[in-house]
Amino acid sequence: MGGGSRFQEPVRMSRRKQVTKEKEEDENFKSPNLEAERRRREKLHCRLMALRSHVPIVTNMTKASIVEDAITYIGELQNNVKNLLETFHEMEEAPPEIDEEQTDPMIKPEVETSDLNEEMKKLGIEENVQLCKIGERKFWLKIITEKRDGIFTKFMEVMRFLGFEIIDISLTTSNGAILISASVQTQELCDVEQTKDFLLEVMRSNP
């Protein structure tokens, strides 16, 4: 009877060791998985915060709301670009208006806005670029240039090349001139004077 008990005790100890070893192996297996999951969640959180920083209006801080607001904002930007391109193409294709009563070639027609009118009085049709900083990485841009084929397309290409994101934009035209006003932002540091000089040089060059 006593000998049987002494025989069973080593068996129990062996089983305990086996169970303990299996638990340790299971913990060692779970640990890398938990670390990988933690890194994945951190990366996802960082990407969501980066996405949120580009969206001007966020209705809620939940993941689903941030993604939904970003999709809505991207759709609005795409529609704005589409409408602007359509408007500009229509302006390029439209024949110039001629005032039959205006016989003096030195008399310039009235422009569409007082702002453009003041600029035209000072500079005529000469190209002019103004770039003002309105935030840490946000700027207000105004360009006056000659109205010619492909000028708006060139402007959009240059802004993409410089790394600017267009937040808001408007176009105003008069006979022979176009005013582009835009609110833009960039993720990179921007030298205002160098950027102005580069834009002015590009706007003055042939399309």
Swiss-Prot record:
Tissue spec. comment: Mostly expressed in anthers, and, to a lower extent, in young inflorescences undergoing meiosis and siliques.
Keyword hit for Transcription: yes
Residues covered by the bHLH domain: 28-77
SMART domains: HLH
One BP term from GO: regulation of DNA-templated transcription
InterPro entries: bHLH_dom (IPR011598), HLH_DNA-bd_sf (IPR036638), TF_AMS/ICE1/BHLH6-like (IPR051358)
GO molecular function list: DNA-binding transcription factor activity; protein dimerization activity; sequence-specific DNA binding
Protein origin, superkingdom: Eukaryota
Gene3D superfamilies reported in the protein's UniProt record: Helix-loop-helix DNA-binding domain (4.10.280.10)
Keywords in alphabetical order: Developmental protein, DNA-binding, Nucleus, Transcription, Transcription regulation
Assembly mode: Homodimer.
Free-text function comment from the UniProt entry: Transcription factor. Involved in the control of tapetum development. Required for male fertility and pollen differentiation, especially during callose deposition.
Protein known as: Transcription factor DYT1
Organism field: Arabidopsis thaliana
